Amino acid sequence: LVPINMAVNTAQTILQILVLVLTRNYVVYLSVQIVCSIILMALQNIYITQKYSEVDFSSKDRLPSEKTVEIKRNVSGLIIAKIGDYLVNSTDNLIITKLVSLAATGIYSNYLLIRNMINGFIATLFSGITASMGNVVAVENDEKKLEIFDTVFFCAFLIYSIEATCFMSLYNLFIGDIWIGRNYIFSAGTVAVIVLNNYLTGLRIPLITMKGAAGKYLEDTWIPFGFAIVNLVASILLAKPFGVAGVFLGTIIGSLFTADWYRPFVIYRTVFHAPVKKYFRKYMVYLLLGVGYIALTYWLNAQIYLSNAYLLFLVRGIVSVGVPALLSCALFYRTTEFGAIKTLTIRLVRGTTARLCSKKEDRNG
């Protein structure tokens, strides 16, 4: 399903950009999203029906009552969690509008649009991992589950640390000098807080993925609501003295005081049956390294001056990707997680190369 998701998401992003540029109509922009979502669900249904043709999807057989009750409880927990997540994600814009200004909300929407597009592609990757993790949870022992989780956690660190360095160094350059003008950008300090908040969100994704794969929907249903309350209070208190940066500092505080410490306990206690201190050690290492990568790359890019904004964007982009990637390779190349990702990458490259060569031979034949 990953290629289908990625193809539709790519087409949706391109169409939405064209709609905004050509029509400047937000209703049409949202309509494109709705249509693409319907098309994606239809394609997923066709793929699953063909892939698992041995399954009778029209069967009228009923599940045992205990299974039905379990599914209903899990679905209820999932719905509650989604409502809580919506409350968390929807409060920031409201607080910025009310306590800072409507103009600041408009400026932030530029950053949010770019972030959502990039994160959409990354989410497609992790959506494919969820299904694999579900199989791991079902058939593997606790040690193997933890080993695979550590690899996914490291993968999230690699991806989101590179994304964070790119955002910090390229956000204002792209929005201010290439896209719509320097009147529509935030200060570097505010951008840093926005980037840090997104980075912390990325580091939480492996836990959320494992939670979904293991079906642990009821153990932490209070988390999104607790997160939303702490986020709301902290953001309101910090918005006055620090503006937009204060709102996202409140979000960071909300996550640190709720999801970032409680959810690991749930997963490690109920899925891995292992002590959680190992997770927190890795989390602190990844957090500090991510912040270090952001600071170092931003400083290096600040030393680069070119008159052409497009060329400057290209050069800074190469630096923003290269520095964290090379440093991570140097620091982690002896670890089990790095070895697993290296092996998987080599396997994917070889498989892709073999398929391309096979298609070329078929055409020549």
Residue ranges and their predicted role:
Residues 1-3, 27, 195-227, 237:
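Membrane-interface junctions at transmembrane-helix termini in multi-pass inner-membrane proteins
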Residues 8, 32-44, 48, 64-135, ...:
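Transmembrane helical elements of multi-pass membrane transporters/channels
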Residues 10, 27-49, 112, 148, ...:
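Short alpha-helical transmembrane segments in multi-pass integral membrane proteins
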Residues 18-22, 122, 146-202, 232-240, ...:
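Alpha-helical transmembrane segments of multi-pass membrane transport and lipid-handling proteins
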Residues 26-30, 44-89, 132, 140-147, ...:
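Interhelical loop/hinge segments that connect adjacent transmembrane helices in multipass membrane
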Residues 54-57, 111, 115-153, 208-213:
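Helix-loop junctions and terminal segments of transmembrane helices
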Residues 272-275, 298-365:
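Membrane-proximal transmembrane or re-entrant/amphipathic helices at the cytosolic face
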